[in-house]
């Protein structure tokens, strides 16, 4: 009986190890050439070449410590998307990315004054502790005058792990998926942010 349990445990561990290794071989990894900004697909085991930078194999969560700049991997993803948009004759650019917590507080206070309540203001400007801008993992593109480029990013952004997240903000994108995955459904507004 003991030998049977040991054998079953061995098979379980063996299958977990082999399953993990197989899965890692098949998890795609987007690699961007640092000079040409072109993309190549690798996998998480092989990784990227020295002349490339990884766009990551998952969503980009905010760190535990507040940053003072836009997330580096988010910038790589945006630069890759920007290069692809340019090839398609579209222009995309960041209007707003990282914001300090203090700046987000000011923007929210202005929105409260404009809309008359925190509840209504939250539809358009996320409260400071909810907004992903102070964490460096949100960008606003082409606002307010060039929604066509932002539309290109909405259609093609998933290739780069960038998704529009709010129905009422065509300009707001976040790295909520791995490059190549499908973007989640839009939420109505910033009041529905996860975190």
Locate the predicted segments by residue:
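Bacterial N-terminal signal peptides that target proteins for export
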Residues: 1-8
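Extracytoplasmic cell-surface/polysaccharide-interacting catalytic and binding patches
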Residues: 16-97, 101-195
